[in-house]
Amino acid sequence: MLQRIYLDNNATTRIDPKVKEIMDPFLRDHYGNPSSLHQFGTETHPAIAEALDKLYKGINARDIDDVIITSCATESNNWVLKGVYFDECLKKGKNHIVTTVAEHPAVRSTCNFLESLGVEVTYLPINEHGSITAEQVKEAITEKTALVSVMWANNETGLIFPIEEIGAICKEKGVLFHTDAVQAIGKIPVDVLKANADFLSFSAHKFHGPKGIGGLYIRSGVGLTPLFHGGEHMNGRRSGTLNVPYIVGMGEAMKLAVEHLDYEKEVVGKLRDKLEEALLKIPDVMVVGDRIHRVPNTTLVSVRGIEGEAMLWDLNRSNIAASTGSACASEDLEANPVMVAIGASKELAHTAIRLSLSRFNTEAEIDKTIEVFSQAAIRLRNISSSY
């Protein structure tokens, strides 16, 4: 069987063997409903508490009760935006939300939905480097602003947004602040206190945990109308039977993610840089966005004259997995929205390829990717009508 190389880790990651190992007993033996009063239920409580302890410490929250279990970051993002709509827009008349054009569809689409209900949403444009400034946020805030929602790191470019500065402005202005940290956790340090975040979303499968489980940090003292009703789980904040094995797995994945932060920076970052430098030697290849203020695993490259989908399928034939952008939208085969937002033509935006590494990638895999990518660029340009 040919070697398979996975370079789509911003879409999802392989589960860490240590995570699977710690989950197994709760799939096989300790399968009781935690809400049950008998021993099958109560014996799961220590493991849940330990997992929550790992989660709140992993983001430097003040209290274990500040982290609420959800099914994924999409749910977390929806909960924040719709909860703020109920709590601030309807009840207090604060009918304005500030976000950016670079957000994940889970935020953008929810904001579009809220607009249909009469909420005013300001979508801050990104600059030629793919970022925004804290000053843009400050200028956009009005007395009617209920929430600012800005991602910590972009899923396509890996660019890190000025979260601490934005959080400080929101605190000063008395505006709630939410950050989608899905692409930051496990790659760079994430500290909700330094960020002055009121809400923070995360998803286990982006840091080598299981799919179908995520979390939402809600700062102590901040209220948020529940998205789901029908039970008193998570202190009455999120109804639904607790998914014990996945909670346990997510806790362990968070612990391992924090432990591997130096490895991400020193090893994964150097592999990404090696890949990037080699690809830049191919004529008319460019890296999209700021190359300095990024998470260490991500590069978004444009190969002029080659449709991103064509390159993607060529790599796939050689058992190399990459992406043209967000996995939640990639089946649509639309132009890369970040490239469009920074002012690239739609023709150029269609040439984007995202390569995202993990701690499980090897230098041999990167060398093979460089070889295959370079050969594919030559072959596809020879048959391209636009190069």
Curated annotation (Swiss-Prot):
Q: Does the keyword Iron apply?
A: yes
Molecular function per GO: 2 iron, 2 sulfur cluster binding; cysteine desulfurase activity; metal ion binding; pyridoxal phosphate binding
Q: Which domain of life is it from?
A: Bacteria
List the SUPFAM superfamilies: PLP-dependent transferases
Q: Which GO terms describe its cellular component?
A: cytoplasm
Give residues annotated as binding [2Fe-2S] cluster: C328
Give the UniProt subcellular location, in the record's own words: Cytoplasm
Give the positions the UniProt entry annotates as the active site: C328 (cysteine persulfide intermediate)
* Record bears the keyword Iron: yes
Residues that bear N6-(pyridoxal phosphate)lysine: K206
Listed binding positions for pyridoxal 5'-phosphate are A73, T74, N155, Q183, S203, A204, H205, T241
- Reactions accelerated catalytically: (sulfur carrier)-H + L-cysteine = (sulfur carrier)-SH + L-alanine
- Indicate the family of this protein: Belongs to the class-V pyridoxal-phosphate-dependent aminotransferase family. NifS/IscS subfamily.
HAMAP family documented for this protein: Cys_desulf_IscS (MF_00331)
Spell out the protein name for this chain. Answer: Cysteine desulfurase IscS
* Protein's organism: Helicobacter pylori (strain P12)
| Encoding gene, per UniProt annotation | iscS
